[in-house]
A protein has these predicted regions:
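Conserved ABC transporter NBD signature motif
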Residues: 56-67, 72
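H-loop/switch region of ABC-family ATPase nucleotide-binding domains
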Residues: 189-190
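Catalytic Walker B motif of ABC-type/P-loop ATPase nucleotide-binding domains
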Residues: 154-157
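Helix N-cap at the start of a conserved alpha-helix in ABC-type nucleotide-binding domains
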Residues: 165-167
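Conserved ABC ATPase "signature" region
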Residues: 96, 100, 109-125
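A short, surface-exposed alpha-helical micro-motif characterized by mixed small hydrophobic
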Residues: 195-197
Length: 258
């Protein structure tokens, strides 16, 4: 579980995140939307312990991040926008190295290879140097790490940017599997197709504040865009009307936050 309680961060007196209250339970994929500078990446950095909050608190499972960021990061697998691996090591060797940083037991190479292929890395790439890996292949190593360490949380920052449609589908399937495994998944993205594919809930951020949380159940890309535009486009559409299971129209379940 990921929990933020009145979490705030300012830089030079300018608020980047303002009193965020958020809970992402185990097994949920939660997607954060918003323009650049809205506070999305700041939120990830505070959960990861890469930055210290100005006030409030972030928790990963029961671990309070600020006093013990290393313990918190042991619970997390993190997919940044640009995954960096050791280029001279193979995918299997990279996985063994990073796993060894967070736990004493590292499975044998055969088990690591299985985890990598389960995460979607082509079998022929498992024992090749990572210098020849594409962005999507590097991401698969981190997703295998999430499985190997049984991470309680998976954080992703714009993971689909620069990927071709096939790689996006593969990545979304892997993220969905992590949620099904029981990880709390928090993904920052502008990719509405990915959001429609995997999110259980959506959060919209604006100027450091979480201004809306909506259920993603049954929402299309167009529905999500309409929801987003209500906060940023003065001429945006009204709340979309979506067909219910019985054919009647139904608006998306949502919480307006102010």
């Amino acid at each position: 579980m990921l929990t933020a309680k009145k979490l705030s961060k300012s830089y030079g007196g300018v608020p980047a995140l303002d009193a965020l209250d958020l809970e992402v339970p185990a097994g949920e994929v939660f997607c954060l939307l918003g323009p650049n500078g809205a506070g999305k990446t700041t939120t990830l950095n505070l959960f990861l312990g890469f930055a210290r909050p100005s006030s409030g608190a972030a928790y990963v499972a029961s671990v309070h991040v600020e006093p013990d960021p290393i313990a918190a990061r042991r619970q997390i697998a993190y997919v940044p926008e640009q995954v960096r691996l050791y280029p001279h090591l193979t995918g299997c060797e990279n996985l063994a190295y990073f796993l060894g940083l967070s736990q004493t037991h590292v499975p044998p190479a055969a088990e690591l290879s299985r985890l990598l292929t389960t995460a979607g890395l082509p079998e022929g790439a498992v024992h090749r140097p990572a210098s020849g890996y594409s962005k999507g292949m590097r991401q698969k190593v981190v997703l295998a790490l999430s499985q190997a360490k049984n991470a309680g949380a998976l954080l992703l920052d714009e993971p689909t940017s620069g990927l071709d449609p096939g790689a996006v589908r593969d990545l979304c399937a892997a993220i969905r599997r992590e949620g099904d495994r029981g990880a709390a998944v928090l993904m920052v993205t502008h990719d509405l197709g990915a959001v429609a594919s995997i999110a259980r809930r959506i959060g919209v951020m604006k100027a450091g504040r979480l201004v809306e949380i909506a259920s993603a159940a049954g929402l299309s890309e167009a529905d999500i865009l309409s929801l987003y535009r209500r906060h940023f486009d003065p001429h945006g559409e009204a709340t979309p009307q979506l067909p219910s299971r019985h054919g009647a129209s139904a608006a998306p379940a949502r919480e307006a936050l102010s």
